Amino acid sequence: MRLIKSLLMISMMSSLMSCQETITNDKWLATLPSPWTLTQEQMDETLPQFQQRFPDFQDRLKHIALWRVGTPYEIFKLGEEVEPDLDPIIRYDVSDCTGHNLTSLAAAKSSNWDDARNNMIKLHYKPDSNGVKQPSYKSRWHYTVDRITMNPNTVDITQSLVPKAALDSVNITLNQKEDGAEFLELDWKRTMTAYYIPNHEITPALMAKLPKIVGVAFVKPRYFKMGIVMGHEGMIIDGKYLIHASQSAGETVKLDFLKYYFPEEGAFFGGIMIFEFKENS
């Protein structure tokens, strides 16, 4: 009997400590300054704390994403710091949808500002013929579907979640409009088939299959004629919540994914692709 009581006590204490750890992590995030207010030096002090507190990479990325909720929204605010786009290579004071995903991933891979900037270059730019990633407007991953099917840091897992026969697809030449002209002046195009999860397959059962954090890219069929597949991207955490930089909200928000995706007036998108964030690539 004494042994049983001891085992029960150990079990209760273990459960209590686990609960307290979860609460502690949430409260710890609340004690941090808002990331959009921090200087580079303050980021140097903060990023190592995430490394120490969340040694698991996916857990660290998830909590960095949560920390960034509230970041002011501004679109197209990442650049190369040279003409034609003088915006900074990395920043945390404002964000748009792609900016949120990539700068959060860069932070999760890094222990200081310089590391984050260098990692952002690896995430946001294509290698040249010598394998060197040199930031330029033309070498940037401009198209989300191109990035998640070719960049080893953000890897498409759509076909591992839903059988290929149940997916929708589009054959498309990225960056080429119906009249054959380029959408962006890149001297580049790519012909590909994109497979995506149609709306009727986006269900609680699908959400239950997801890892603790994944990327989600939103398909916009009316953009196909412009050589574009995606209209938005964000993160899904815990198989339930969307964290994304929202233009309508004017900031980064966390909300129920299925409620966001299926509003009363009907879905805004034609499907989704799901991708993983990789620590090492």
Indicate residue ranges for each PLM-predicted region.
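Sec-dependent N-terminal signal peptides
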Residues: 4-14
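C-terminal motif of bacterial Sec signal peptides marking the signal peptidase cleavage site
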Residues: 17-18
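Cationic-aromatic interfacial patches
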Residues: 23-99
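Acidic/His-rich structured neighborhood in mature extracellular/periplasmic domains
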Residues: 71-196, 210-212, 220, 238-240, ...
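Short alpha-helix capping/helix-loop boundary micro-motifs
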Residues: 195-207, 222-223
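Extracellular/periplasmic catalytic domains that process cell-envelope and extracellular macromolecules
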Residues: 208-211, 228
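Structural motif
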Residues: 213-214, 232
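C-terminal soluble interaction/assembly domains
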Residues: 219-281
